[in-house]
């Protein structure tokens, strides 16, 4: 009875692994479809580049603004973009490990010197379990978010710098490089101290109303668009990471199925050989 029991066990494992393979394959195909639809990134990038050009033109004429000037740092804000779901390989863990405040000096920052703004349920759960100061969060965003979906948290985030709550603000997210490569990125969002260095004046504009009023309107919009652009970048990275993770899971499941099938065939052959041997032995005993 033992070989038969072993055959049943192997067959059960094969069927279970096949079902798992079907699920991971379906998830891979869904993620591939979502990645192919994540085309808003290019539109937003063009929009940000145009705002950059206009603002750099104004600022290069000697106009200053609080969002363009560094100040003594008493409190730092960290905007962290994660996903609402797992099964995406190291997508989330790479980001939260970068933010977890064992900074370069390997010392924990006092809670009153930093605060965290989280996009995504995975990051929110991670930081709350460690009693880290999360002051803003948003979850359950759609797979193809519009600016309206994050307008409120983007406005509040920029406002926390404008009102002096934060003296500097950093973003952490996964930057989409390709379907098989995503890079964990740390980007200084505010103040925009590198803004002028990265943008040389290209076009001469005539401004109406005053240049100061233009900066008051455009700089917050630009900072908010940077947050939205990072979110779209992170969403594309999430879909790519999940697609890759599910493909690897499907490939591994297929390898297991092949190994189990080989074991099943060998066990079945051994069982048949044993039965034939017993029949022949019984016949010889009767003679």
Curated annotation (Swiss-Prot):
<dbReference type="GO" id="GO:0046933">
    <property type="term" value="F:proton-transporting ATP synthase activity, rotational mechanism"/>
</dbReference>
<keyword id="KW-0139">CF(1)</keyword>
<keyword id="KW-0375">Hydrogen ion transport</keyword>
<comment type="subunit">
    <text>F-type ATPases have 2 components, CF(1) - the catalytic core - and CF(0) - the membrane proton channel. CF(1) has five subunits: alpha(3), beta(3), gamma(1), delta(1), epsilon(1). CF(0) has three main subunits: a, b and c.</text>
</comment>
<keyword id="KW-0472">Membrane</keyword>
<dbReference type="GO" id="GO:0045259">
    <property type="term" value="C:proton-transporting ATP synthase complex"/>
</dbReference>
<dbReference type="Pfam" id="PF00231">
    <property type="entry name" value="ATP-synt"/>
</dbReference>
<dbReference type="GO" id="GO:0042777">
    <property type="term" value="P:proton motive force-driven plasma membrane ATP synthesis"/>
</dbReference>
<comment type="similarity">
    <text>Belongs to the ATPase gamma chain family.</text>
</comment>
<keyword id="KW-0406">Ion transport</keyword>
<keyword id="KW-1003">Cell membrane</keyword>
<dbReference type="GO" id="GO:0005524">
    <property type="term" value="F:ATP binding"/>
</dbReference>
<protein>
    <recommendedName>
        <fullName>ATP synthase gamma chain</fullName>
    </recommendedName>
</protein>
<dbReference type="GO" id="GO:0005886">
    <property type="term" value="C:plasma membrane"/>
</dbReference>
<comment type="function">
    <text>Produces ATP from ADP in the presence of a proton gradient across the membrane. The gamma chain is believed to be important in regulating ATPase activity and the flow of protons through the CF(0) complex.</text>
</comment>
<dbReference type="InterPro" id="IPR035968">
    <property type="entry name" value="ATP_synth_F1_ATPase_gsu"/>
</dbReference>
<keyword id="KW-0066">ATP synthesis</keyword>
<dbReference type="InterPro" id="IPR000131">
    <property type="entry name" value="ATP_synth_F1_gsu"/>
</dbReference>
<keyword id="KW-0813">Transport</keyword>
């Amino acid at each position: 009875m033992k070989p038969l029991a072993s055959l049943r066990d192997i067959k059960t494992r094969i069927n279970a692994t096949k079902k798992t393979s079907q699920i991971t394959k379906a998830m891979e195909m869904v993620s591939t479809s979502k990645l192919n639809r994540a085309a808003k990134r290019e539109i937003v990038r063009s929009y940000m580049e145009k705002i950059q050009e206009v603002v750099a033109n104004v600022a290069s004429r000697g106009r200053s603004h609080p969002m363009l000037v560094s100040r003594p740092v008493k409190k730092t804000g960290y905007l962290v973009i994660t996903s609402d779901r797992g099964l995406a390989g190291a997508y989330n863990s790479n980001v939260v490990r970068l933010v977890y405040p064992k900074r370069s000096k390997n010392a924990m920052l006092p809670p009153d010197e930093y605060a965290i703004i989280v996009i995504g349920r995975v990051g929110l759960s991670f930081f709350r379990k460690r009693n880290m100061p999360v002051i803003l969060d948003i979850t359950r965003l759609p797979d193809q978010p519009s600016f309206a979906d994050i307008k409120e948290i983007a406005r509040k985030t920029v406002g926390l710098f404008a009102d002096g709550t934060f003296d500097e603000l950093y973003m952490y997210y996964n930057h989409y490089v390709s379907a098989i490569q995503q890079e964990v990125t740390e980007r200084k969002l505010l103040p925009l101290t590198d803004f002028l260095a990265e943008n040389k004046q290209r076009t001469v504009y005539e401004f109406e109303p005053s240049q100061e009023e233009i900066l008051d309107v455009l700089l917050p919009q630009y900072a908010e668009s940077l947050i939205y652009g990072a979110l779209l970048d992170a969403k594309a990275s999430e879909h790519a990471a999940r697609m890759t993770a599910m493909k690897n899971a499907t490939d591994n499941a297929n390898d297991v199925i092949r190994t189990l099938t080989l074991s099943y065939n060998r066990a079945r052959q051994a069982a048949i050989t044993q039965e034939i041997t017993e029949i022949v032995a019984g016949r010889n005993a009767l003679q």
